[in-house]
């Protein structure tokens, strides 16, 4: 065991997910790219060399399909990326998504019971660019409601979830929590921050 640690400013891990069929295979979204391990974390190798990978989604039915949200103010090649070979190669998604000029975070979630249904939220630092949905695994996208889920913290704190039994129930969180009961057509703000 080596107890000689060094600290590097502004380097962090944003997200860690695992393959639901192989718990030895994990993926880490970091400030320095996306990393993969096939031996439970003993060794890691970079699989997406982009600055500020902030969110990862592994398809629960087809774990060879992954999505990675890349970007913040300083990212060059920001956008939503998809891999169809366990993270070995990546392509930038664009069919129906806006130009990647945002300076905030991209988050992504998928339907645990329908591999084709994916939702992404693209944000600026203090506001939402858009909420988008794909019903064909990311081949094309269409815009959902224009709720400002990312207000005040679009570069940092956000979460997204499609309910595992009722895919019409979607939760999106930032400073406030938003809920849709019709598959994302309308989101209603459920909380009010008063700090």
Language-model segments: residues:
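Extracellular glycan-interacting surfaces
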Residues: 1-195
């Amino acid at each position: 065991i080596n107890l000689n640690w060094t600290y590097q400013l502004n380097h962090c891990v944003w997200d860690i997910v695992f393959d639901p069929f192989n718990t030895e295979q994990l993926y880490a979204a970091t400030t320095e790219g996306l990393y993969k391990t096939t031996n439970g974390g003993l060794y890691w190798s970079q699989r997406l060399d982009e600055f500020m990978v902030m969110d990862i989604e592994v398809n629960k039915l087809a774990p060879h399909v992954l999505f990675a949200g890349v970007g913040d103010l300083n990212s060059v090649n920001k956008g939503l990326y998809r891999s169809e070979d366990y993270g070995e190669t990546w392509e930038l998604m664009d069919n129906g998504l806006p130009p990647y000029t945002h300076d905030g975070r991209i988050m992504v979630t998928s339907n645990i019971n329908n591999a084709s249904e994916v939702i992404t939220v693209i944000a600026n630092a203090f506001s939402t660019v858009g909420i988008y949905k794909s019903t064909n695994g990311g081949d094309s996208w269409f815009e959902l409601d224009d709720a400002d889920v990312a207000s005040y913290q679009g570069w940092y704190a956000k979460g997204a979830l499609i309910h595992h039994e009722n895919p019409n129930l979607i939760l999106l969180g930032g400073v406030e929590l938003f809920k849709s009961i019709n598959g994302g057509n309308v989101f209603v703000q459920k909380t009010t921050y008063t700090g």
